[in-house]
């Protein structure tokens, strides 16, 4: 079972590239971030044409997440991250697909830091940790994917110096991410690539893609029940180099079939 995550940086702008990727790679589940459209503008019919059913949590012009499943209906479990009823940003959705709880998130960027945007990021991560602890207690196969906007370690960026003042790798961001892992989650890509050097994002500026100046901020976290089924994980890097590409590449994890 392949579960993929792709920050598409706008459904409207990227739909041909997205359809292309889905048809070529055919993940069982595809989680999208930054769909950047209102609920009534999400192109669900286009995905149905190629066999994918979808649920989504949209927001006009910003944020937005969706879960697509190949040939089956994803069963929505949670919409919006619990813990703050005043938070109206569309960044979080959960669904059950083929016996796996799939969590899709778009974590706040936090720049500029310090400031209220960074404070919101850290508070959001604490709420996320609380929700993920609840999911761990359920002891079900759970996969948490998305754009976390956190560079976990120095090995996960092309240049520590270039990123040292960015919210993506501040000590508070890294500590919050580490606390989540320490609760019992497995970072699939890091587990299979312990030496680092795996990028999932390349900026549009300064020739970052051409110079391979990237970093890893799109993550795939597995509960113990899912980690036992880990077969492979990787990045579909080639899609970042295609015409009108997102600044992220798709990431994916392969789970063995449940016995």
Which stretches of residues belong to each language-model region?
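Surface polyanion/phosphate-binding segment centered on an Asp-His-Pro turn
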Residues: 234-259
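Active-site beta-strand/loop signature of hydrolases that rely on acidic residues for catalysis
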Residues: 3-7, 22-40, 102, 131-154, ...
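Surface-exposed cleft-lining segments at the edges of enzyme active sites
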Residues: 82-83, 108-125, 162-165
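N-terminal, active-site-proximal structural segment of metallo-dependent hydrolase catalytic domains
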Residues: 1-65, 180, 259
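Active-site-proximal beta-strand elements of phosphoester/diester hydrolases
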Residues: 1-10, 99-114, 145
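Conserved beta strand-loop-helix elements of the APE1-like EEP
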Residues: 61-75, 196, 208-229, 255
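Metal-dependent phosphoesterases centered on the DNase I-like endonuclease/exonuclease/phosphatase
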Residues: 50, 124-217
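Structured beta-strand-rich core segments of catalytic domains in phosphoester-bond hydrolases
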Residues: 35-38, 42-112
């Amino acid at each position: 079972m392949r579960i993929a995550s792709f920050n598409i940086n706008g459904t409207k702008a990227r739909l041909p590239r997205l359809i292309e990727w889905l048809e070529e790679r055919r993940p069982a589940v595809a989680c999208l971030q930054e769909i950047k459209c209102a609920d009534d503008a999400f192109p669900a019919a286009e995905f149905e044409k190629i066999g994918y059913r979808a649920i989504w949590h949209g927001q006009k012009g910003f944020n937005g997440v969706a879960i697509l499943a190949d040939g089956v209906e994803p069963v929505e479990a949670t919409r919006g991250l619990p813990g703050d009823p005043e938070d109206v940003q569309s960044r979080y959705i959960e669904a059950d697909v083929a016996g796996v709880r799939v969590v899709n998130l778009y974590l706040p960027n936090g720049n500029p830091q310090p400031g209220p945007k960074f404070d919101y990021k850290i508070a959001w991560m604490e709420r996320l940790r609380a929700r993920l602890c609840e999911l761990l207690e359920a002891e079900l196969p759970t996969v948490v994917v998305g754009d976390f906007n956190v560079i976990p370690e120095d090995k996960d960026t092309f240049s520590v110096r270039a990123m040292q003042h960015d919210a993506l790798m501040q000590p508070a961001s890294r500590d919050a991410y580490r606390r989540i892992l320490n609760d019992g989650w497995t970072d699939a890509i890091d587990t299979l690539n312990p030496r680092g050097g795996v990028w999932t994002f390349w900026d549009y500026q300064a020739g970052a893609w051409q110079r391979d100046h990237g970093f890893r901020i799109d993550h795939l976290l597995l509960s113990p029940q899912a980690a036992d089924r880990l077969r492979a994980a990787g990045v579909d890097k080639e899609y970042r180099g295609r015409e009108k590409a997102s600044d992220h590449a798709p990431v994916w994890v392969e789970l063995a079939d449940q016995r």
